[in-house]
Amino acid sequence: MTRFSFKIHATDGKARTGAIQMMRGEIRTPAFMPVGTAATVKAMKVEDVRASGADIILGNTYHLMLRPGAERVARLGGLHKFMGWDRPILTDSGGYQVMSLSDLRKITEEGVTFASHLDGSRHLLSPERSMEIQRLLGSDIVMCFDECPRADQPREVIARSMEMSMRWARRSRDAFDAGGEHAERSALFGIQQGALDEGLRKTSADALTDIGFDGYAIGGLAVGEGQEAMFATLDFAPQQLPADRPRYLMGVGKPDDLVGAVERGVDMFDCVLPTRSGRNGQAFTWNGPLNMRNARHAEDTGPLDERCPCPTCTKYSRAYLHHLHKSGEMLGAMLLTEHNLWFYQQLMAGMRAAIAEGRFAAFAADFRRDYFAR
């Protein structure tokens, strides 16, 4: 079986469609990865996540290292066996969550010392420890350890942060390669940094390319800069990365973010939005998002989305979903989460088909017309 390969099947402008082959299966691109923070995609069984069309899910190093602990997961047979998911898993490095603990962490060249949000216990997360945790979890796609600075900081601060992330990338590469059997069946992605600065992004991309990775992530976006600034950065950042490797935009995003990023050459995405929104009563549809707590749905016997074939849309009315969310019933969160994941996977499938058929521009225009019609 192939450890890791990426083949581009078709392009349309900057948009690409293809497939990643790994030992645990194929990942069709552009791909959206549901987020399974604590070894679960919230409110979903793994078989239902797969039924939605997901080829790969994301696990969170920070949360899993604290509870139940990477060593315990390893003793229990690894993350796949632990949660019952037999397809590829990408794990983040833990860096983003640790950096967000601004009052509870200290950054040095060695790594980041932080206090657990659970019990206050002290931990050091370094490139080497991050690689060890992801190996213990049994991740298929491992992410380098990096720092994600705020985009509104001075250029010299962002430059110093990026340069340290590149040194950490080298250490991540070395530690990953020393991982024995796990390194022989998994892949390692580097993470480009540099905030919104084209020159810093180019320096970062060149440093990562010199080290060499199976894929490349675009980090440091979707952290409050806004869609306009994000798209302006994506006008150049993906093209700075190797064209023959997958490009992964971390933490993105809203449906229109995904379309705009694919338009600019991105292949992979993850975001908590479809699951978190589902728990909070928001449904994504081809005609824009719906707030199912709104009284206008109270007697609506129609489905969430007439174009959606998901179990929620084929079995339940808007009125029933409104009732569940107004009543605080957990089934409401489950049904909207299931629908949202189906919607995201249908969006990705639609983009893949449109790119393959050379009609992506028309697909994107039609999507925006309908999605923003309200």
Swiss-Prot record:
Q: What is its EC number?
A: 2.4.2.29
Query: One Pfam family, short name please?
Result: TGT
Q: Which reaction does it catalyse?
A: 7-aminomethyl-7-carbaguanine + guanosine(34) in tRNA = 7-aminomethyl-7-carbaguanosine(34) in tRNA + guanine
What residues does Zn(2+) bind to?
Answer: 308, 310, 313, 339
Top-level EC class: transferase
Q: Name one GO biological process term.
A: queuosine biosynthetic process
User: What pathway annotation does it carry?
Assistant: tRNA modification; tRNA-queuosine biosynthesis
What are the required cofactors? Zn(2+)
Quick one: where's region RNA binding? 251-257, 275-279
Binding residues for substrate: 92-96, 146, 193, 220
| HAMAP family per the UniProt record, alphabetical | Q_tRNA_Tgt
**What does the subunit section of this Swiss-Prot or TrEMBL entry state?**
Homodimer. Within each dimer, one monomer is responsible for RNA recognition and catalysis, while the other monomer binds to the replacement base PreQ1.
Q: What is this protein called?
A: Queuine tRNA-ribosyltransferase
Task: Name the species this protein comes from.
Answer: Novosphingobium aromaticivorans (strain ATCC 700278 / DSM 12444 / CCUG 56034 / CIP 105152 / NBRC 16084 / F199)
Source taxonomy: Bacteria, Pseudomonadati, Pseudomonadota, Alphaproteobacteria, Sphingomonadales
